[in-house]
Amino acid sequence: MKKIDIKILDSRIGDCFKLPKYATPGSAGIDLRACIDNTISLEPGETNLISTGLAVHIADTGLAGIIIPRSGLGHHGIVLGNLVGLIDSDYQGSIMVSLWNRGKEIFTIQPNERIAQIVFVQIVQVYFNIVDNFQKSKRGERGFGHSGRV
């Protein structure tokens, strides 16, 4: 199994803030927590960049990190400001999470609250070749629902 070294920037993690971990043996993502001193109120329509206290350098060009929302926050209208985050293998820095309140109510983020998840995925890079045409397929150029609904 591939291991990735995650650096902890904030010395309070493991003491005041819980150390990130997989919740179950079958968990694909690791919860990221708000590493903040005080509550943050997100007004409807507002975004805020929240520190996780973590930094990462994946350093393997075959891997990337994907930051995705937690379904429990989506229930309250809280989503990621950029909807999904991508951490390239050569990025070396802090993991920050942009939260956006799409709801109609003020939402309060508590210190140590789980605010997003990170999933590590394998990456395949593609090569582009200029061609005159493709080999014909049954589907052809039909898109936007042409493969059927059922």
UniProtKB/Swiss-Prot annotation:
Cofactors required: Mg(2+)
UniProt KW keywords: Hydrolase, Magnesium, Metal-binding, Nucleotide metabolism
Entry annotated with the keyword Zinc: no
A Pfam family matched in the record: dUTPase
Binding site residues for substrate: R70, S71, G72, N82, L86, I87, D88, M96
Superkingdom, taxonomy of origin: Bacteria
InterPro entries membership: dUTPase, dUTPase-like, dUTPase-like_sf, dUTPase_trimeric
SUPFAM superfamilies referenced in this protein's UniProt entry, alphabetically: dUTPase-like
Pathway where it operates: Pyrimidine metabolism; dUMP biosynthesis; dUMP from dCTP (dUTP route): step 2/2
Alphabetized GO MF terms: dUTP diphosphatase activity; magnesium ion binding
EC number: 3.6.1.23
Protein's GO biological process: dUMP biosynthetic process; dUTP catabolic process
Catalysis: reaction(s): dUTP + H2O = dUMP + diphosphate + H(+)
Keyword Hydrolase: yes
Family statement drawn from the similarity comment of this UniProt entry: Belongs to the dUTPase family.
Function: This enzyme is involved in nucleotide metabolism: it produces dUMP, the immediate precursor of thymidine nucleotides and it decreases the intracellular concentration of dUTP so that uracil cannot be incorporated into DNA.
PANTHER family the record matches: DEOXYURIDINE 5'-TRIPHOSPHATE NUCLEOTIDOHYDROLASE
Protein name according to UniProt: Deoxyuridine 5'-triphosphate nucleotidohydrolase
Organism: Baumannia cicadellinicola subsp. Homalodisca coagulata
